[in-house]
Structure formats: C-alpha cells, structure tokens
Amino acid sequence: MIIQLRLIAKKGFIVPLHYKSLLQGYLYHHFPQDMGSFLHDEGFQSGSRTFKHFVFSDLQEKARKVGSFLHFDKEITFFVSSPVPEILEGLGEEILRNPGNLGHNLISEALVSQATPDLLAREVAVVMISPLVVYRTLVQEDGRKYTDFLTPHHPDFPTLVKNNLLRKYESLFGDVPTNLSFSIEPLGPFEVRGQYFRNFYLKGTYGRFLLKGDPRLLSLALTTGLGSKNAQGFGMAVHAP
C-alpha cells in the first residue's frame, strides 16, 4: 500500500537541508499511539534484525537552497509505503484529522490519497524516489570498524540487496521459501549522493533499476523499500515511467 501526502502551508515551507529526520518525526507523531509504540520499540523481527516495514520518499517539489535550509512553496508532496496496510491506514486518518506542524511550519491543510501496487510480473523497471543505501561493516587492521557503502557496480551489491529483502520477508511471513529468486541491476547511469540522517552520514544511489524474480519479493521491494534505512527515508522505489 502506498499513500501520497500533500501538505499545504500558507507561508510556504522551510526545512533543513538534511530533512529526513524531520519527515520521520512527523510520521511517528501521526501514527496511532499503539502502532507508533510498536514500530519504535519492537518492529518486525528476523533473527537479530528488526524492520519497521515502512519507507518514505524525498520531497518531490523543487526547492531553493538558502544556506543550510531548503525553501519550498506552499505545497510539498511525499510518498509513504508499507506492506502492512494497518500502518498507513491509521497514519492517513490522523494526518487528515490534525495535520499539525512540520518542524516550525504550520500546516493549514493535508490531502491523502492511496493506491495498492498491482504487481504480478516477474520483472519491473523502477526508479528510486529516495536513495538506495547498501552497506556493510568492515574491520580495519587496527580493529576499528567502518562502514563501506556500495554502489551498483560493486559485485556484492545485488547479493546484499537480495539478502536484506529475504530477511524482510522472513520478518513478515516466517519461513522463507527456498525458490524465491531476486536480482537487481542498474538501467543506465546512476548518481550517488551523501546526506545526513541526524548525525549519521549515509551514501545512497538514485537512478533506474531492473528488478527480476519472484513477484512476492518484487511486491515487497516496492512496499517496504530496497536496501537499508527504509524507515529513515531511504530506498523507496516506484514503477519507472
């Protein structure tokens, strides 16, 4: 399930250059209390990994950069997706009832629309509307750990994306069938950008990708997100035009 959120502020919007944590905070503030507490404190388990099973996009409108802030006109739009309909149903209802504030921006009106992706094919072309983050933790010779962010040309990139998706499947449905196939490859040029989520620096990829495999995994990829840090606003993919 995917919902589109359109927020309107009479004076326009001013948000930080790295605004992902602001959007995440807005969503958590509008989740119904029980759902928000569950997602924040527990989530969905796969071994030692925990998944929130929602993802959100970048803001879709163009902005003017002024110092360390972005200035938007009176309306901003972003998308939120989840394979668990209950997560988004309560969210949309609460935002319509009480749009509230986005940071210091008073929201005068909110519009919510929804769609359920119909995906039965075994391959689909997608475009990232928030950056795809793929990383692994390595250890240096002195024993210190560091984060290695992978680009689509790295040979381990497809494997890490697939393994992450299989763990997400397991956290939702239990056992993972042995015949679940999945592959990902870039379609044309892509762009790697760095940005912060709070004090954490992340690198992610924008571009188009071809996903192939079991429709159950392809559907999950489009609703829960690809790669890591989905609940922080990374890895949302939609059908490519």
Which residues fall in each region the model found?
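RNA-interacting cores
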Residues: 1-241
